[in-house]
Structures are given as C-alpha cells and as structure tokens.
Amino acid sequence: MAMETGLIFHPYMRPGRSARQTFDWGIKSAVQADSVGIDSMMISEHASQIWENIPNPELLIAAAALQTKNIKFAPMAHLLPHQHPAKLATMIGWLSQILEGRYFLGIGAGAYPQASYMHGIRNAGQSNTATGGEETKNLNDMVRESLFIMEKIWKREPFFHEGKYWDAGYPEELEGEEGDEQHKLADFSPWGGKAPEIAVTGFSYNSPSMRLAGERNFKPVSIFSGLDALKRHWEVYSEAAIEAGHTPDRSRHAVSHTVFCADTDKEAKRLVMEGPIGYCFERYLIPIWRRFGMMDGYAKDAGIDPVDADLEFLVDNVFLVGSPDTVTEKINALFEATGGWGTLQVEAHDYYDDPAPWFQSLELISKEVAPKILLPKR
C-alpha cells in the first residue's frame, strides 16, 4: 500500500482577509483536494492568531462535507480546555453522524497562551514547546478530564461527574408507555455508536501529546520539527502504546510538512519563495519559530546556527519542494532517516487570489508522488 495524503488548514490567511474569504478558500481547498484524491483534511481551531483565524472548524467541516464525496475531515484540533466537554461531545457526535463515516476527531490543549487567557487560563506557556509551568500542566490535565466526560456521554449511560474543572452528566431515560416517544433522549453518540478515531498533534521533542496518543491508542500527528524530534515522537508514542497493551502501527502516523510541487525544481522554488508560502514564512512563521526555539531542530539537521536559518535555507533543506521526482526523493530520504509514516499532511496556504499553482501542486502530490511512496513496516 502507498502513503496517504492530507491537508492541514490552519489556514495561514494573510491579515486583511475577511472571514468570508477564509471560509470560501477552505471550501474551495476541500473540493479540490477531494477531486484529486487527497484522503483527509484537518482544520485548525484558533481564537487569537490573526494568521490562524478559524475559531469554529466544525462550521467549515459541515459546509465542505456537502460539496465533497470521499475526503475525511477532522478538527485539528478542538482545544478541550476551552470548551465544556458536554457541549463538545454533543456537537462532535452529531457532526460525525452528518458525515456518515468521513469524520475523525483531533484534540489538543491549546498552543497559544493568548487563546488560553481568553478562556480564563492565565500564565499558560506554549503547550507544544518546552515553555510553561503549572498552568501548562493543568491544560494537559484538563484534556484528560474532558476526554473522560465526553467518552462517558457517548456511551449514553446515566452518570454525574463532579470534577476538578467541570461538572457534567447524562440523565437516565424515563420509561414511558409503549409507543410513547416523548420521554426518549436524542442520540448524539458518534457515527457507528462508538467514539470516533481520535488524533493528537505533537511538536516538541518530548511531546506529552505523543505519550497520550500512545497510552490511549490515538492517531499520532507530528508537526515536522527536525529529524531528531520526528524520531523521538515515534519512540515516545511506541513506548507508551506498548506499555498500555497496544500495537504501534506506523501507517497510522501522520506527519505535517510544507510541501509544494511544480513541473520543475526551479519553478517550484520560485513559486514558494515569491508566493504565499514565502510571504507567510517571512512575515509570520519564521519570527514565531525563532521566538519559541522551534527553528533549532532544522538548524541542527543541517549543522548551522539557528539564526542563519532563513527562508531560502528552509526551502532548500527542510521543505519538500520541487518536481514530483524530487519531492519523492526527499520523502524517501526522510523515510530512510526516520522510519517513515502513513500520511503526509500538507500544510495549506493562502492561494485565494491565484489558486492554480496550489491546486496543481496538490494534484501532483496526490497522483505522482504519494503512489510511489510505500508504507513502512510496523
């Protein structure tokens, strides 16, 4: 079997885009991805960042589902500390029923302190980096309690939970006369009657999210941050999975990366350097990565000082940019160095004004790159 492909839509829209433009670009991206055989689309949830400005991914998922046939969708991720688990469990269950098997669930603790602050959580560090203290630990505790409540609600069995962070329950269904349906409770359990597949993202070297994924047999999604971190993610995930009695399977591992294909290497590099991807990295991602030490892994792989890691360095040495043959070679080299993965999750960017280069890239990745990448052994 060959590697699967997916999109991850943060959405990295440049400041000044309207909410309607962002929404429309998400729908167009989903339709194009579905038409060229992309397997999945993850849509981020953020409440504070101007470049990552989708607070309700479920709205985009519901709208895109009506215009697509095969592609699966996931919020990536619902930030569990920011929402009441009973409300979230009900919404997730209903949306998964609407999508009839094309839904999986991404969960997270929240990457940005500003968003946590908006939800009443002060002094939280970057949950996907090494910063943060007790409040960051509390975010991870909140994730676990929220999951406990949601899974209880999906079972539709009576309970009441008085927790550290939330109180929630599920009422007992009242008995009525035969044929009397006025006392029955609506069924908002997920499609198929059991919890949906759950995925979590990890970035930092010793990612607590990867440990949680292994413990709970969730799908691990690594944000590529260098060879050492990617290898460590699989080690942490595998160790936790085996300790919990699960069998780790690399085909379930997804890796999120910056990928762009064109007919030639020269054209691909030019389109990235001069286009929306380059603009986003120069204005937003490179400054953030430097601020939080997230450039260190890339620099270490190349043996340079992180301060010397600029856009051209990333395009030439980190991103998967080039012709289909070149991108295939780069992925195979990463497989050789890290052990491989099952899904390449392509980072989406703001090609709203001129979609053609991006749509061509997605088609080349799906049809000319992915089929040549064989799934790794477990």
Curated annotation (Swiss-Prot):
Query: Does the entry feature the keyword Oxidoreductase, yes or no?
Result: yes
Q: Which Gene3D superfamilies match?
A: Luciferase-like domain
* Enzyme Commission identifier(s): 1.14.14.155
Q: What protein is this chain from?
A: 3,6-diketocamphane 1,6-monooxygenase
Q: How does activity depend on pH?
A: Optimum pH is 7.0.
What upregulates or represses it?
A: By (-)-camphor and, to a lesser extent, by (+)-camphor.
Q: Which residues bind FMN?
A: H10, S44, M76, T201, G202, F203, S204, Y205, N206, S207, P208, S209
* Keywords, alphabetical: Flavoprotein, FMN, Monooxygenase, Oxidoreductase, Plasmid
Similarity comment text for this entry: Belongs to the bacterial luciferase oxidoreductase family.
Q: Pfam families in the record, alphabetically?
A: Bac_luciferase
Q: Which reaction equation describes what this protein catalyses?
A: (1S,4S)-bornane-2,5-dione + FMNH2 + O2 = (1S,4S)-5-oxo-1,2-campholide + FMN + H2O + H(+)
User: GO CC: one term?
Assistant: cytosol
**Any stretches that span the bilayer, and where are they?**
none
